Amino acid sequence: MDGAFPGCGVMIHHVSGDADPLFQTDKFAATQPDPARQLAEVKKKAGDLAQRRQALAPAIQLLKNAVCVPDKPCPVFDLPWQVEQSKSGKTSISGLSVMANMVETLRLGWSENLPLSQLAWDHITRASQITALLPLLTENYDLSNDVFYTAQKRGSILLNAMLEGVQEGATPNVRWLLLVAHDTNIAMVRTLMDFSWQLPGYSRGNIPPGSSLVLESWRDTHSGKRYLRVYFQAQSLDDLRRLQMPDSQHPMLRQEWRQSGCQTTDVGTLCPYQAALTALGKHIDRQSAPAVEMALP
């Protein structure tokens, strides 16, 4: 907050307990997926995992070259991809998930400006090398948080809060509401919104550090008509590494949501307000979206 509003002393509000209903939905009964159905939905979407793995062979080989010692065993890259479910009911793709974690670790190291010697032992020296690995993250999103049933059970409560936040009479009554979420939360919400993006230097649907999913409420002062602008934005890999402040020479990378009836304007893509709210909220599971109070103290 000090970065956005230096010297203003803006307070940060948070839940008093250990679990936040908007972001830690695995802690609450209303937002818990049924394990059997979740397993079935993941298997249905996954299809032929061997074929999926083969399609990503180039990215897998690049990752192996980066993190494995030449001529030494690196068994994780020999594992078949399989759908697995833990005792807690969480479903994942063994083999893929560990590769995705490796890629995320390398991407975070790059973004945090770690010395190149600490990035896969000097094997990662250019942003383009990170870009080439990111399809593995996209694949992991596709088969986890982007599975529609999972997103609907766990993301409905957050999307509902976001849409309520841009309505007239919303609580809290503020001009700018920032919800600090994980990439997993954004992934589930964008799935329900039918909103995907591909920013330059990133794979489809990638959610970089510091990125944001933005909803803006606009009103035409002449006609009184209301509009909604929705977009996803992030900085480039190189700008993140340099801690580059966004400016005219280093603009934010941005992709806007649109549907029929939206119009391109000087301030961005504006969509008729009620039609946009209806479209963005049509997949919300109301039973998984109990009311959340965000009144300021």
What are these regions (language model features)?
Residues 1-177, 183-297:
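Signature for phosphate-centric chemistry
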